């Protein structure tokens, strides 16, 4: 057996059917779409339509609401902070806040503030000013000899009433 003699098994590669190419092709005229009407046209499916049966999105009750005053915080974990300190993108001796994290490229944007989360280990002594922090994050920073200052969230996005 030579490399040039290797071939596929018979029927392993099936030629694709070209539709709408004459009656003799076996997929001509209607092209496998049946008769006329809505389903024969392109872009056929009506989303959520169940043939007249009450659709699922109308059978289920409405729930909840969108709070327009909801605050969205950018989250940062301790391990990410430690990596930035090790890479020398953040100065551990300076006060770390939302602006310094964005300037260093650790966060893309600070949204309504920054929330510190406790995943990972912190070796450096830090002074951090954030808008929120978990108990485990505060404990880890204080254990490393640092301090966490919780700031008030940024000003309300909505108009004054």
UniProtKB/Swiss-Prot annotation:
PROSITE patterns: RIBOSOMAL_L15. One of its GO terms (molecular function) is structural constituent of ribosome. This is Large ribosomal subunit protein uL15. Gene3D superfamilies: 3.100.10.10. Residues 1-43 are annotated as: Disordered. One of its GO terms (cellular component) is cytosolic large ribosomal subunit. The gene is rplO. One of its GO terms (biological process) is translation. Part of the 50S ribosomal subunit. Binds to the 23S rRNA. Residues 21-37 have a biased composition (Gly residues). Belongs to the universal ribosomal protein uL15 family. Keywords: Ribonucleoprotein, Ribosomal protein, RNA-binding, rRNA-binding. It comes from the Bacteria. InterPro entries: Ribosomal_uL15, Ribosomal_uL15/eL18, Ribosomal_uL15/eL18_sf, Ribosomal_uL15_bac-type, Ribosomal_uL15_CS. It comes from Rhodopseudomonas palustris (strain BisB5).
């Amino acid at each position: 057996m030579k490399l040039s003699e290797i071939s596929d098994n018979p029927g392993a590669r099936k030629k694709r059917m070209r539709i709408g190419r004459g009656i003799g092709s076996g997929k001509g005229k209607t092209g496998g779409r049946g008769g006329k009407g809505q389903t024969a046209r392109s872009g056929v499916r009506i989303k959520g339509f169940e043939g007249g049966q009450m659709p699922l999105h109308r059978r289920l009750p409405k729930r909840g609401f969108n709070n327009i005053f909801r605050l969205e915080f950018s989250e940062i974990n301790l391990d990410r902070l430690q990596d930035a300190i090790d890479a020398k993108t953040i100065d551990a001796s300076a006060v770390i806040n939302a602006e310094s994290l964005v300037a260093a490229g650790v966060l893309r944007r600070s949204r309504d503030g920054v929330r510190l989360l406790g995943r990972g280990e912190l070796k450096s002594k830090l002074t951090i000013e954030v808008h929120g922090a978990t108990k485990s994050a505060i404990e880890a920073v204080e254990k490393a000899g640092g301090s966490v200052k919780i700031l008030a969230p940024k000003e309300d996005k909505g108009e004054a009433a």
